[in-house]
Structure formats: structure tokens, C-alpha cells
């Protein structure tokens, strides 16, 4: 994505859109919260061609096989790269164009109910493809599964959790005020999953159907994607 010189009103993670039509200018003014005006879409996809593609790719990839999840992440990156309006977000009642395409998801350190979780983020490039995204996912997932490591977002949350409750609430309130004006630290934007283009939840990995998930008032996430279980269909 082409980098533009930062101007007054821009954020660390996005460029203020100054040429909106009247409808898009007024929308964030009459819906004060990010979750007040959402759209939900559910799609059923024939995986025949994807399964054949995965079989071919995995003939030479045995250490970290390609999966449906990897292909869907790559498809989301490609779609949003080609349709940059999907990568807009609202903050402080203004529309912004995000500076990059990024994806976030939760990784279980072990496949067990009581196992710890880690938060992973990948930052895509204009030239990203299935192979490069697969490599990014390999790095993130293997790193997150290391039981001796704690990801940045979890580490930050633990930091607040160990404080006296009143102090933690006060500091989070300060962060929300900073975010309204685009002053939140860049370190949070780079690692917090709710500051990415899309949060992905692979419920199919635990045999659940696809559900719906709202956006959050915290952060700037533009899309929330749920992946359901694969099933045979006539």
C-alpha cells in the first residue's frame, strides 16, 4: 500500500478521509459507537477446488502443511488489498483509510480446554501471496505455541490484571481517551488484534458451526470473520 505523508488529522494507523460524500460523513455522527451500524453476511463455499489445491501444495510441504485456514487468510488479504474500502475504519466519528492490511487470530498453545491462548498478528504486503502468507503463519503459529513465550498483547493484559482493579480501570480509561484522538502508543496498534484489518476465528477447528461476531468499540478492526466446520454436502 502506497505510503502518504502524514497530515494534520491523520492517525498512526490510518489516513483521515477528507473527501467523503454526505452520507458517509453523517453516518458516524448519528451512530456514536462503532457497533451501532453493522452488517452480517454468511456464505457457504464449495471446497472441492480448494481441497485439490491443498493436496497438490502439500505434496512438497510436509513440515507445516497448507490448510484451509491458510488459504482463507490469503484470500482475505487479497480481497481487501483489491478492495481497499473494506480496510476503512471509524474513530472519533471520522473515517480513516488504514495504512496496511493486517490479520489477527487466536492460537491455542495445546489442543485442550485448559490450554493457554496466544494472540497472533500478521502484517501483509501488496505483493503477499499464498506462499508468503503461509510462511508468515508458520512463524506466528509456531512462535505462539511455545509454552515458554507470552505474546505482547497477552503480556499487556496480564500487566493490567496484576494491578489494583481501580488503577487498571483508570489506565484503560486513559488509553481509550488517547485512542479517540489517535494518540495511543504505536506498540499497541502493532500487536493488539483489535487494531488489525480483520480478526479471524476458526471455529471449525473445534467442530463448531459458523457464527456471528460483533465488532468492538475498542480498537479499529474493520471485519470479523468466523470460519465454521467443513461438512459434506450433496
Segments predicted by a language model, with ranges:
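C-terminal catalytic/motor cores of large multi-domain enzyme assemblies
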Residues: 1-234
Amino acid at each position: 500500500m502506497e505510503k502518504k505523508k502524514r497530515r494534520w488529522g491523520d492517525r498512526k494507523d490510518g489516513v483521515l478521509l477528507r473527501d467523503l460524500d454526505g452520507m458517509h460523513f453523517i453516518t458516524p455522527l448519528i451512530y456514536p459507537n462503532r457497533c451501532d451500524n453493522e452488517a452480517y453476511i454468511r456464505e457457504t463455499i464449495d471446497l472441492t477446488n480448494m481441497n485439490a489445491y491443498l493436496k497438490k501444495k502439500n505434496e512438497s510441504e510436509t513440515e507445516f502443511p497448507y490448510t484451509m485456514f491458510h488459504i482463507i487468510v490469503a484470500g482475505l488479504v487479497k480481497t481487501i488489498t483489491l478492495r481497499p474500502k473494506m480496510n476503512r475504519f471509524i474513530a472519533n466519528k471520522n473515517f480513516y483509510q488504514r495504512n496496511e492490511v493486517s490479520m489477527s487470530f487466536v492460537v491455542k498453545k495445546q489442543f485442550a480446554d485448559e490450554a493457554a491462548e496466544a494472540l497472533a498478528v500478521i502484517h501483509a504486503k501488496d505483493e503477499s501471496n499464498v506462499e508468503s502468507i503461509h510462511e508468515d503463519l508458520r512463524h506466528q503459529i509456531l512462535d505462539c505455541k511455545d509454552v515458554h513465550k507470552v505474546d505482547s498483547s497477552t503480556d499487556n493484559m496480564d500487566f493490567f490484571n496484576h494491578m489494583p482493579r481501580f488503577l487498571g480501570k483508570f489506565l484503560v480509561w486513559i488509553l481509550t481517551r488517547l485512542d479517540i484522538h489517535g494518540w495511543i502508543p504505536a506498540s499497541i496498534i502493532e500487536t493488539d488484534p483489535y487494531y488489525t484489518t480483520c480478526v479471524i476465528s476458526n471455529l471449525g477447528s473445534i467442530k463448531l458451526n459458523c457464527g456471528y461476531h460483533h465488532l468492538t468499540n475498542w480498537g479499529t478492526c474493520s471485519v470479523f470473520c468466523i470460519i465454521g466446520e467443513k461438512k459434506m454436502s450433496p
